[in-house]
Amino acid sequence: LYGPESLLALYGNVVPFICSNTRQYPDIFLQRAAALTLCKFMCISAEYCEANLGLLLHLLRTSKDAVVRANAVIGLGDVAVCFGTLVDENSERLYAGLGDKDLGVKKNTLMVLTHLILNGMIKVKGQLGELAKCLEDEEMRVSDLAKLFFSELAAKENAVYNNLPDIISHLSTGEHAVDETTFMNTMRFIFTFIDKERQAENVIEKLCQRFRLTTQERSWRDIAFCLSLLPYRSERSIKKLVDALPFYRDKLYVPDVFQCFSEILGKMHQGKSSSAAAKPSDTDLREFEDVLAHAASQSKQDHALEDATQTQTAKLERRHARPLVSKGQPSRPARTTRQTRRRVT
């Protein structure tokens, strides 16, 4: 592309110019051909790729033609095979295709990301939450592809476990959060891959610590729901949950949170009746049951007292805000006026 006698060099500058000037070259087929040619040229020259990667990403984000966007995604996948470092540095912009309104663009993006991630061509940097959204996509083909991706990813040691905190945060809070029903359905599938007892114990500890970092009831419900999806087969799991009681004690007045912990208690009883080697003891179960009931009762009382205090404080503030003017007492300006009139008379 840069040799003095190279035939392709004649088109090296023409192709980006056409892609960048859609008003001057509005023909849709010309734009599609130029975008494809740009992708192919980028695969044969690192210098050309680095110079025009920004343009290709711009086409993926702003092109009004879904065919151009879909081809740009595939082209980025091919470029990643040739020059993985360049694409890896801009991988977060590739994930944007998962939110495209066009089914073809979304499906191509999901397939390209699946190929690149599973083959280690790009690193996952906290963006698995966007892929997890596809598990509940309305289009069955997208949903099935997402399930296949996570099933293959789970075959890699600790891959899903290591990214679980980021997935939960991405789907539960912030601008990327999904509704609670979608969150629950997604987590039910994701947590099927957390099947090792050691992993479950660590997740229990990490999730419980999140209770103290948020003041939103939605987040409390999401955390409690995730805790209810974990297996509780050993004494260590119960101990982790009991030791973390100070983190969630004051949240148990929320019905959904308490319900999730009640389901956890039911799982513990099931674990006791199973033939697991490290099953929880009767003492552990009674201790957790008593602690849970007492904490829930205390939390309800504290919450009721807090509401009553806030109500009383609001009444006092409104009372002090009223003007203190006696009935029938004239204002100072009026009294001054009458005095002035008497003097004149």
Segments (PLM) and residue ranges:
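Long internal repeat-built scaffold domains in very large eukaryotic proteins
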Residues: 1-17, 129-135, 141-345
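Alpha-solenoid helical repeat scaffolds
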Residues: 1-121, 196
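Polyanion-binding and phosphate-handling cores
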Residues: 80, 87-91, 95-166, 171-172
